[in-house]
Every structure is written in C-alpha cells, then in structure tokens.
From Swiss-Prot:
Group of enzyme by EC: transferase
Pathway(s) the chain acts in: Porphyrin-containing compound metabolism; protoporphyrin-IX biosynthesis; coproporphyrinogen-III from 5-aminolevulinate: step 2/4
Native organism: Hydrogenovibrio crunogenus (strain DSM 25203 / XCL-2) (Thiomicrospira crunogena)
Needed co-factor(s): dipyrromethane
Comment field (misc): The porphobilinogen subunits are added to the dipyrromethane group.
MF GO annotations: hydroxymethylbilane synthase activity
Name of the protein: Porphobilinogen deaminase
Amino acid sequence: MKKTLRIATRKSPLAMWQAEFVKAELEKHHEGLTVELLPMSTKGDKILDVPLAKIGGKGLFTKELEDRMLAGEADIAVHSMKDVPMVLPEGFALGAILERHEPTDAFVSNDYAHFEELPQGAVLGTSSLRRKAQLMAARPDLVVKDLRGNVGTRLGKLDAGDYDAIVLATSGLKRLELDERIRHELSPETCLPAVSQGTLGIEYFEKDPEVLELIQVLNHRDTEIRTLAERAMNHRLEGGCQVPIGVYAELEDDQIYLRGLVGALDGSEILRSEARGSQKDPETLGVYVAEQLLEQGAGEILKEVYDQA
C-alpha cells in the first residue's frame, strides 16, 4: 500500500480548504499515510476579465490538475463537482464523491437583508448564467453584472461599492468560515442549484487500483446517487459548467426526487421539469427529466446561449 499520496489542487483559498479537508480525512482513515498537496493555477483562475461562458472549453478548472497526474507528479485531484466536465478524459475516473454540503446559493449584501428588498435598478453580481437567468426571472427590474474572482475578491468588490449585492455558493462561504456574510440562503424554488453544487469529488487514474482503494473510503453513497442523477440530466442536455441549467436531486425513502430547469439568459423564459424514480437507476431519471425539458424547447434556449458565447 502507498505510503504517500499527492493531491493536485487549485491555489484559491477555497480549493486549498477542500484539498486540506480531503488530506485530513484520508490520513484519519489510513494510519501511516502521508498526503501532500501540489497547488497550482488553472486556466479558469488566470482569466478573470472575461465571463466564464465566453472563455469556452471544458475543464477550465480541471485540465492543469489532470496534466500533473499524467506527468506522474500527482496521484489524485480534488474538485468542486460543479466544475467537473460531464465526460472525463480517457483514463481518468471519479473514485469518490464526498458527502454533500449545503447546495444552495447565498444572498450577500451590506445594505439589504433579503433578495426581495433590493430596489429597482439595483446592481447584482454573479459569475453564473444559471443564477442570472433565475434571478432575472424573479426580478427583471435588477441589473445583473458579471462577477469573477475567488470568494475574497468577489466580497472585496461588493465592499468597494461595485455591487449592491452578490450571490455566491453557500457551501464556499461556510467552508471559509464567512457565514456572517450570508444575509439569507436562496431556496431551490427561487434559485435551483448547479449540478452537484456543494459536493467534492476525487479524480484518479483508472489504471491505479491502489489509489482507488485508498480514496473510496470517503465515498458517500447517498450523495453519489444524487450526483449521478444530476450529472445525467446535465449531460443529456449537453450542458457544461457554464450554462443556465439548474438541477437538484433529493432522496425520499427509496426514491429520488429530481428537479431541473433551463433558463433564457434574460430570465424571459424558464423551463421546468421534475420527476421521481428509483435510487437504483439515478441516471435514467436524469435523462428522463432532460428529455422533458428538451420537449419544452430547452435545446433552442441552450443553442442561443452557445451562439452568444
């Protein structure tokens, strides 16, 4: 059995927190194992003056980490699952899906306690087309502007007065112990989360079963089921990370309750679908919900988004 395991991770404070968390969990479960971190920047980290949807390409936050693994410099990579492409490069696989943290989006403002309190014409910041579509649908009177950078950078722009409010992932703020910045969490009814939001995944080389044996102890089966359903819906819609697609799976007894949506960027049209299915076949349920959305015209909305990017 390996004595040392090397984790490729992004350099941002949140990514480092996630890698440190996985390191601690692995060392707790495997006595004598030493876990090392290899921090690096990715394409998505370096290009901060262009909306993510316009940069294009899959693996904006994952490719450089995979390159380190290919070069033999790292054994695994820790990812926020919402950044992981629907299809991984050949030879790579997800060896563990960790227990999901809060999947919601958080409303953050220095002047307003609630999203509904924002005055007409208020400037709302988000980097997500999914959030933009849903929040514009709820409040077409707002001005939604792009917001890039890590969590600290985004909060700094809010504090500098560039925005009246911003929306960030609840899980990221809580992991960085910035709970006090959250004015309230947006319900899934207001803003359906991104695929696998709040979930961490560990990527490894399929040809290395020894590594899989070490990491699969962290796999959380209930979260894995939810992740499979959400990613199957997203994959059928041919959605990447930067698309106006929301999806949220919940477990109810032996069933999965899956909600999905596709939204026009200006919020003028929001298509919704939901269904229940067996936990034994989450991917079939995901594809079914996607097909329902496509029947409503989701393909045309997404084509417009890709054409604008």
